[in-house]
C-alpha cells in the first residue's frame, strides 16, 4: 500500500502532571486523606476536542489539554469520575439558546455514563442498573444536536443531553437477540449503525426506532452480510467500512452507490485500522473534504479523488496510532491518539510563529503492570511481571520503573548489557537500605537484575554467581521470586526449582547458598522472602506449601551454625490457619503478621521459634460482629500486609480492597474499596509506604494509586516540627497536620488566650487535628499555638498556626 507518513518534528514538551483540583496548597503538598493516581497516561486510545480543550482517553482515566497554555489536567476517580475503565468519550458543544454549557461525555465498560465539566460530574447510571442481561459496555458515542447516541453491547441508547435522561433504546435486532453496536452514523436522513453482525439502517423519521422492524440490514455488504464491522464512515457520497476487528480486517469502499471494492492498496489478508475521520466535524467548513485513515503506525490523508495528499512533515511509526480527530475550532490541526507518544498535535500547514506540533501527556509510569512494590522514603520501585495461579510466567516484558523524588523514571540498559525491556516477568524488588539508589529485582526467567542510579548494571545467573537455572519443565529458567535486603545490606533471595533455593548476596558482593540438606529438591518451588529485625529469614512456599523460617545465627556468611524449620497448619508446625501464604511483615513491636488464604495470622513471640517444644504458634484475632464472634477477615485472602508509622496494619486482599487495622488489630479503622474510594480494582497485589511523608502506595490489578496517610516516621528530637496547611484559609475544609513529632507525642492546640481547643496524639511522627472546636464548629480566625511533648514527657516543641478563614 502506498503510504505517506505524516511525520512530526518531535520537540517533546516536558509536562508536569497536574491535578484536576484547584487547590490552594503549595506545590508538592496535599492534604492528609487525599488520593493520587499513578496511571500510565502515555497510552492514549481516543481523542475528542471541544470548547477550549482537547480530551484524551486512556485505559484507566481521561486527561485534558489546553492547546493555548499547554496545561494538562488528569481526570480519574480521584477527581470525581465514577469508574476507572472508560471505553468512550465525546464532547458535547452545549446549547447556547437554552443556556446549556458544553461538557464531556464519558462511557464505561459496564454501561455507566458520566457527564463531566470542570465544576463536577453528573452520573447517569440507567444502563448499568437496568435489567438488561448481557454486555452493557459503551463502545462509542455519537453526538447530534442535543442528543448522544451510545453504541452499546446490546443496542443504541439515546441520551437527552439537556434533560440528562435516557430518551430511547434501539434494539436493532430485537430484545430477544441483542446485537453489539460498534458505531452510529447519521447520513442525510438515515441512521446507519455498524454492528458485530453487519450494517443496519433506518429512516430518521421512523416513529419506532426501538423496534427491530424499523431496521434493514445491508445484504450487499462484501465478504458477508453478517461481518463484524469495526468502523464505518461516509466520505462525501462514498461509504467506507472496515470488516473484521481493529487488528486484522479489510477496508472496503462503495463509490456513490457502486459495488463494493477493496480500498486501493489494501492487503487482501487484512491489516490494522484504528480510525477513520474527515474534516467535516470542524465548526469551520473546510474548502475541501479530507479523509484520514489511522493505521497501526501511520496516518494517511486523501482528497476527494482518493489522491494521497503530498507528504507533510514526518510522524514516526513508533507512535502506534489509535484514534484521529480534526480540531473542531482549527481545521488545520489534527489530534492523534497514540500508544507511545500520548496525545499528538499535528499542524497540517505550519507557519513561522504559529501553532507548533507537539506531544502531550501527564507524567506517570509507562504501564499499569505491577506485581510487587518496594519503597524507601521518596524512592518507589515497581516489579512489573507476574505468574498465574499455577506459577507459570505471564511472559510480561515491559521493563521496570520507579517513582524517584516525585518523578517517574524508566530503568535504562547500559551499553553491552541485555536490553532490560526484553527481560520477562520481574516478580520482586528490594531497595538497599544502605543506598536507596541501589535496587535489586528478581526475574522469573533471568535471575537477579541489579540497578544503580536508574541504570541496569548487572544480571546475575549461573555464569557469574551461585544463582542457577531451575527445572521449569520444557525450558530451563533462572527463577527468582523473592528478594529482601536485611539491615546490614545483605540481599536474601530465593532461587526456584533448584537445589539451592535460599541464597544471600553479602554487602561485599559475595554469593552464598544456604545448605538446606534434603529439605528441597529441584522440583520444589519457592517464593517471596522477608528478613526480620532479629535476623530470621521468612520464606513463602507457594501453592499451599506454608512457610520456611531460616535462622542464619547472625552469620550469613557461615552456614554451619544455621537452623531452619517449616510452618504449616499442623499444631506441631505453628498452627497456621492456612498453608496458602501470600505476605509476611513485621510490625513495630516485632510481631510477625502473615497474610494467608484464611485471613491474617500473627506470631506474637518468635524468640522461641527454634525451641524443641514447638510452643510458638500462630494466632488469629477474635472479634465480635453483629453479635457473633469470628476471626478477623477469616474469609479473605490476604495478599499484602504493611505497617505504617503508627504501627497500624494496612491489609490488602484478593477481592475486597484494603483494610486499615488499629495498632493491636482489633479495630478496622478504614476499608477502602473500588466502591467507596478511587481504588481502581479490589484485587490488591501489594502495598508499600513512604514513611517520610506517610504516602501509602496500593498496587492493584489495574494499576497503582496512593493515599496520603495519617502516620509517618518520627523524630525523637522534634527539632523541626511544622504545620500544614499554614495559614489555613477559607478554601481549606480538610484536616490540619503537625509533622516532625516523636512517636505517640501528645499535641495541644490553644488559642492566643491559652485556652485549649484541641488535643491529639500523633501516629508515628504526624498528628492530625480536624480543626474543630469542642462544640464541633470550625476554629475561627486567629493565631493558635501548637505544643507537643513526647510520651515520656522528656522532649517538647512548639510552633504557631494561623487561621485566616
Label the predicted regions.
Residues 747-757, 784, 793:
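Short, glycine-anchored, charge-dense loop/turn motifs used at functional sites
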Residues 785-805:
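C-terminal tail/sorting-segment detector
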Residues 383-398, 446, 498-500, 545-547, ...:
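Short, conserved, GDST-rich strand-edge loop motifs in beta-rich repeat architectures
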